[in-house]
Swiss-Prot record:
Domain RNase H type-2: 10-198
Protein name per Swiss-Prot or TrEMBL: Ribonuclease HII
Catalytic activity: Endonucleolytic cleavage to 5'-phosphomonoester
Gene from which this protein is expressed: rnhB
Gene Ontology MF: a single term: RNA binding
Organism: Salmonella paratyphi B (strain ATCC BAA-1250 / SPB7)
Keyword check for Hydrolase: yes
Broad class of the protein's primary localization: cytoplasm
A GO biological process held by the record: mismatch repair
Cofactor: Mn(2+); Mg(2+)
Cofactor annotation remark: Manganese or magnesium. Binds 1 divalent metal ion per monomer in the absence of substrate. May bind a second metal ion after substrate binding.
Entry GO CC: cytoplasm; ribonuclease H2 complex
Listed PROSITE patterns: RNASE_H_2 (PS51975)
InterPro entries (UniProt xref): RNase_HII (IPR022898), RNase_HII/HIII (IPR001352), RNase_HII/HIII_dom (IPR024567), RNaseH-like_sf (IPR012337), RNaseH_sf (IPR036397)
Length: 198
């Protein structure tokens, strides 16, 4: 992996999203400005960490970061805008929520939302940029907790296990029970369950 070279600036925010692929719930984003004086050991792409390690780092990031913020776009916004535009909106909300304005924003992936400060997309940024790794951890822990809470209300769907992704089990239960108010109606498997497409 090519080592990432940081822009010449001090207050760098990292941004990442979780939940573009699921059929249910919000897409959740986070923005994080780390404190160079309080390094956090072990930051990595949230998907490469155990749940226990993510939870430990989640608390440490919130305690040590200069600023952090969560953003989101709800299922109905995803349906209205489409998943790409809703993700960009959620990223804008995360950056806007930082109580310290960043001088530069690094975003995981290959495109940036419109922001009032300079920004750059970083492919595989969640593995290459500590700020993006931290954002990916905050976003994933937050969204996983939301899926666990939804699982209590709708235990038949198994949200705590698959986090809303279109697993065979989820698709089976969607066909059996229909869609909840939290499902994304613009996504093809949900449309099929609702009888909106053949």
């Amino acid at each position: 992996m090519i080592e990432f070279v940081y822009p010449h600036t001090h207050l760098v925010a990292g941004v990442d999203e979780v939940g573009r692929g699921p059929l249910v719930g919000a897409v959740v984003t986070a923005a994080v400005i780390l404190d160079p004086a309080r390094p956090i050991v072990g930051l990595n792409d949230s998907k490469k960490l155990s749940e226990k390690r993510r939870l430990s780092l989640y608390d440490e990031i919130k305690e040590k970061a200069l600023s952090w913020s969560l953003g989101r776009a709800e299922a109905h916004e995803i349906d209205e805008l489409n998943i790409l535009h809703a993700t960009m909106l959620a990223m804008q909300r995360a950056v806007a929520g930082l109580h310290i304005a960043p001088e530069y924003v690094l975003i995981d992936g290959n495109r940036c939302p419109a922001l009032p400060v300079p920004s750059m997309a970083v492919v595989k940024g969640d593995s290459r940029v500590a700020e993006i790794s931290a954002a990916s951890i905050l976003a994933k822990v937050t969204r996983d907790a939301e899926m666990a809470a939804l699982d209590i209300v709708f235990p038949q769907y198994g949200f705590a296990q698959h986090k809303g992704y279109p697993t065979a089990f989820h698709l089976e239960k969607l066909a059996q029970y229909g869609a909840t108010a939290h499902h994304r109606r613009s996504f093809a498997p949900v449309k099929r369950a609702l009888g909106l497409v053949s």
